[in-house]
Amino acid sequence: MEVKNFAVWDYVVFAALFFISSGIGVFFAIKERKKATSREFLVGGRQMSFGPVGLSLTASFMSAVTVLGTPSEVYRFGASFLVFFIAYLFVILLTSELFLPVFYRSGITSTYEYLQLRFNKPVRYAATVIYIVQTILYTGVVVYAPALALNQVTGFDLWGSVFATGIVCTFYCTLGGLKAVVWTDAFQMVVMIVGFLTVLIQGSTHAGGFHNVLEQSTNGSRLHIFDFDVDPLRRHTFWTITVGGTFTWLGIYGVNQSTIQRCISCKTEKHAKLALYFNLLGLWIILVCAVFSGLIMYSHFKDCDPWTSGIISAPDQLMPYFVMEIFATMPGLPGLFVACAFSGTLSTVASSINALATVTFEDFVKSCFPHLSDKLSTWISKGLCLLFGVMCTSMAVAASVMGGVVQASLSIHGMCGGPMLGLFSLGIVFPFVNWKGALGGLLTGITLSFWVAIGAFIYPAPASKTWPLPLSTDQCIKSNVTATGPPVLSSRPGIADTWYSISYLYYSAVGCLGCIVAGVIISLITGRQRGEDIQPLLIRPVCNLFCFWSKKYKTLCWCGVQHDSGTEQENLENGSARKQGAESVLQNGLRRESLVHVPGYDPKDKSYNNMAFETTHF
C-alpha cells in the first residue's frame, strides 16, 4: 500500500491542535489553583453554562469513530445512517425528561451513588465495576482509530501516535480537571466541524458538484435510506437504527457517567437540559457531515474502490486515503482533517479519564476514607486521572484486533450500556423493584448481551445480512483484485444464524430488556419493595411524562410511594431535605419527620440550581 506523506504545513496544523489542547489544561490549572477541592476538579464547581457543556457532550461521543467510521459505513452500506437523526431525538428527549431530573436534583457526583440510595451498596459497586471495564474498552477503540488514520496518511509509527494521544489527553485532564476537559472539548468540536466542512467542499468540487454526488449515489443505491424490513438479522434497517440505535445511545447518554457528570456541572437544571438539546443540534450536524462525506467518497471512488482493489487494507482507512487524494496539492488541509479525527479522540479520551477518576474516587476511595482533606482529595483525583490515562492508552493495543471501529465501539456500548440502562430504569421507573431484582436483572442483562456479542464474534452473521453494496474496480490502474465474494462458512450451529446474527445495534436492547424483565420477575418473587421505604425524588415513573393520564393511573404507577401531584409540586418548590453534614440532598434522606427547606429551586424558572449543593453537600 502506498503511503502518502504529510507536508510541513500539515504537521504545523496538526501540532497546533495538541499545543492548544494542552494549553487549555495549563490555563485552568493556573486559573483554578486557589480552588483546590475535589469538587472543583471533578464537577467544575457546578457552575458551568449550557453552551460549552453542550459542545463538550457532542465532542465526547462524536469521536474519531464517527470521523473515520461513519463515512466508511455510508460508502459501503448506504446512507441509512441518516435514520440516526430520529434515534438521537428520542435519546435526548428521554434523557432530559426521564433520567436527568432524578440525577440533577440528587446532588450526586457519581451516577452510581443513586444506586446505593435506591437499592444498596452491592448494586452500586457492581455497576461501577462494569462501567469502568466498559469505558476502558471503549476508550481503547477511540485511541486506536485516529492512530490508524495518522499511520495511513503519513507513515508515522502507529503505536507512537497511540501513546502521543494518551499522553496529551492525560496531561490536560490531570492538570485542569472537568473545566479544562469541557472547554477543550468545545474547541475540538469546532475543529471537527471545520475539518468536515473542508472535506465536503473540496470533495464535492472534485466530484463535479453536489448534484452530481447525489445522482451518482442514487445510481449506486447509496440513497436507499428507509428500509422498513423488520428482520432483526439485517445489519442496518429503519427499525434496527431507530429502535436498536435508541437503546444503544440512551445507554450512552441517559445513564452514562461522562454525560451526567457534565449535566450536573451546570448551574441550573434548566441549563443542563439546554445543554442536552444544544448537544442534539451538534449531533445532527456531525451526522449529516459524516453521511455526506461518505456519499462524496463513493462518488469519487465509484469506478475504482481502493478497498476491494487492495490499495488499502481496511475499510477504516478509506476516509484518510480519500482526504490525501483530494487535498494532494493543498498543504495543510490533510493535517486539518487528521486534527479533526484527533479532536474527536482527545475529547472522548479526556472525558472518559475524568469520568473514571470521578466514579473511582466517589464510589471507592471516599467510601473507604470519608474524612479526606480537600487538598488530599484533589491530589488523589489527579493521580486517578493519570492511572486511567495509562490504562486507556494501553487498551488501544487490543483495539487493533476488534475489526471496524464503528461496530466495535457500539458493540462495547451495547454489551455493557444496555444492562446498565436497564438497571437504572428499574430504579427510576419501577418503584416496586427491590435490590435483589436489581442485582439479578443486571447479571441477567450482562449475561445475555455478552452471550450474543461473543457468539457473533465467533460465528459472524451470514454474508447475505451484512455484505456491502456493490463496489467497482473496473477503472483501477493497478488491479491486484482478489475475489470478494461471500466467505465460505465452516460448520455452524443452528443458533449462529439466528441469535448470534442479530444486528449489533440490538445488543443494547437485549441487555436492557433482559435486565428489566428479570429484575421485575425476581422482585415479584422475592417480595416487592415497600413504597413507604422509597423517597419520591428517587423515582420518576413514565406516567409523569404524560399529563393527560388520570390521577388513578398515576397513583398506580407510584406503587405505594408517598406521593401525589400536590406533594410532587411541594417537593419541587421546597427541595426538602434533612441536614446531615456533608451528605447530598438525597443522601439526607428526605424523611418527613425531619424536613427542612433547602434552597435551590426557582419557582419562576421551575428549575433547580446548585445552591442546594452549596448549602448541604459540601
Curated annotation (Swiss-Prot):
One of its GO terms (molecular function) is symporter activity. It comes from Homo sapiens. Belongs to the sodium:solute symporter (SSF) (TC 2.A.21) family. Acts as an electroneutral and low-affinity sodium (Na(+))-dependent sodium-coupled solute transporter. Catalyzes the transport across the plasma membrane of many monocarboxylates such as lactate, pyruvate, nicotinate, propionate, butyrate and beta-D-hydroxybutyrate. May be responsible for the first step of reabsorption of monocarboxylates from the lumen of the proximal tubule of the kidney and the small intestine. May play also a role in monocarboxylates transport in the retina. PROSITE patterns: NA_SOLUT_SYMP_3. CDD domains: SLC5sbd_SMCT2. Residues 1-9, 69-82, 150-157, 202-235, 297-321, 407-411, 459-504 are extracellular. Glycans are attached at N480. Cotransport of monocarboxylates and nicotinate strongly inhibited by ibuprofen, fenoprofen and ketoprofen. The gene is SLC5A12. Keywords: Cell membrane, Glycoprotein, Ion transport, Membrane, Sodium, Sodium transport, Symport, Transmembrane, Transmembrane helix, Transport. The keyword Lipid biosynthesis does not apply. One of its GO terms (biological process) is monoatomic ion transport. Pfam families: SSF. It is found in: Apical cell membrane. InterPro entries: Na/Glc_symporter_sf (IPR038377), Na/solute_symporter (IPR001734), SMCT2_SLC5sbd (IPR042700), Sodium:Solute_Symporter_SSF (IPR051163). It catalyses: (S)-lactate(out) + Na(+)(out) = (S)-lactate(in) + Na(+)(in); nicotinate(out) + Na(+)(out) = nicotinate(in) + Na(+)(in); pyruvate(out) + Na(+)(out) = pyruvate(in) + Na(+)(in); propanoate(out) + Na(+)(out) = propanoate(in) + Na(+)(in). This is Sodium-coupled monocarboxylate transporter 2.
